Amino acid sequence: MNKKALALSVASVLTYTVPTMPVKAASNAPTSVSDSRTAGLISSCSLSISSGRKQIYIAADIKAIESMKSIGYKNISIEYSSDKVNWKKEKSIDDLLKSGSSYYLNNYSVSVSGGYYYRVSLTHYAKESGLFGSSQSVPNTSNSVWID
């Protein structure tokens, strides 16, 4: 009987003194670089450029968690540099906005002077519908390309 009582005592002591470890459920959602840069209305966004003859081609993408009153790109600036360090604005482009849940630019062409490295800076933007709809902005800068 003493052995049974001792075993029960040890079992109860271990049960109440061993710390429990919190468990977090694994997420099935895929992770990507864009996920870490966004929160809220915008679920992903990207920006890159390629070179052409005296022009650059912009490829940009923005996706929202649902349909938005306004989604797209604001404060679009074409910048140039001779050293990839000191950037100057060559031109601005009007905002590109529409309603919906995504907006994709595929080889959006912009003429440039040439003789420099070029890049694009813009703000990915989404605004909800409704009187008190919130908005989200994510600034982004593209890679740079040389244009003769």
Residue ranges and their predicted role:
Residues 2-24:
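Sec-dependent N-terminal signal peptides of Gram-positive bacterial secreted proteins and lipoproteins
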Residues 23-148:
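Low-complexity, Ser/Thr/Pro-rich intrinsically disordered linker/stalk segments at domain junctions
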